Amino acid sequence: MSYPKKVQLPLTNYNSTGLNLNKSNLLVLYEDMLLGRNFEDMCAQMYYKGKMFGFVHLYNGQEAVSTGVIKLLNPTDYVCSTYRDHVHALSKGVPSKNVMAELFGKETGCSKGRGGSMHIFSAPHNFLGGFAFIAEGIPVATGAAFQSIYRQQVLKETEDLRVTACFFGDGTTNNGQFFECLNMAVLWKLPIIFVVENNQWAIGMAHHRSSSIPEIHKKAEAFGLPGIEVDGMDVLAVRQAAKQAVQRARQGDGPTLIEALTYRFRGHSLADPDELRSRQEKEAWVARDPIKKLKKYILDNEIANIGELNEIQNAVKTELEQAVKFAISSPEPNMSELKRYLFADN
């Protein structure tokens, strides 16, 4: 049996036309990606020290996708994630100390210690949560986009449409909920961006072996929405694609499907020895580290100097050290509230 070919490197190059990024914008992107990477590295340390339990899925290598999309959104916009949700939450503005406390199972966690790694949630930040099963977040995100349309068209509220960014992996795109929600979003012109983080592997199944059409963005054509393929290792390329999608959604023109070609630098979870991917494949993708790529862009174009970038790195390190101290010192959930939040109050 022959399978379609795998994604070939290098991917498309970034075209800067129309982004209008200044120094402040670029440093925000750089800091956000650094925060995500260092947060995940700290999670690995804490997990192996026995401070975290259960499955922990890290996001190393995929930071350009989260940062490139979410940093374009307004605070009132929505984000829906997967079980690999820590960095999406950070990009949406959930404080790192509350995400870390959640991973420690503490009362000060953003889900009161009840969600853990796979169920990060924050209502104040319109972060709709992570989901342990693939595709389960897509209907929730579609519902969030629907209520935005409903508020404007039925309740006659005057605010701009709120955009929903829905993240999921390549393995999800063979699930029926993916197709059903694409269809519904187009029918109702919902303000939603479907972001496929195609990291080439669904646990141990290579994507090119599991789909008759591995080019996921091409599936959009069947439903009548734009499908964009983008280099998910380049935050500026992702931001450019996301900018088009956000504008389209906010002005009421409907959804967009973005396929970001990316790669996770660690195994599927911290329990995965990562023996199925070849060393050559991993090295080829690691050489395209999105953080190093943006750092080089900033330095080569003399947007900031190495001292300024080191200051950002040190600030991130300090923030995460404080986040761990906060998580360790925070109280455990009270046993008397064990059954709280299972049902709606009143």
Curated annotation (Swiss-Prot):
Q: Spell out the CDD domains in the cross-references.
A: TPP_E1_PDC_ADC_BCADC (cd02000)
According to the UniProt record, which cysteines are disulfide-bonded? Answer: none
Presence of the UniProt keyword Ribosomal protein in the record: no
Q: Where in the cell is it found?
A: Plastid, Chloroplast
Gene Ontology cellular-component annotations: chloroplast
State whether keyword Chloroplast applies: yes
The protein's name in its UniProt record: Pyruvate dehydrogenase E1 component subunit alpha
To which species is this protein native? Pyropia yezoensis
Name of the coding gene: pdhA
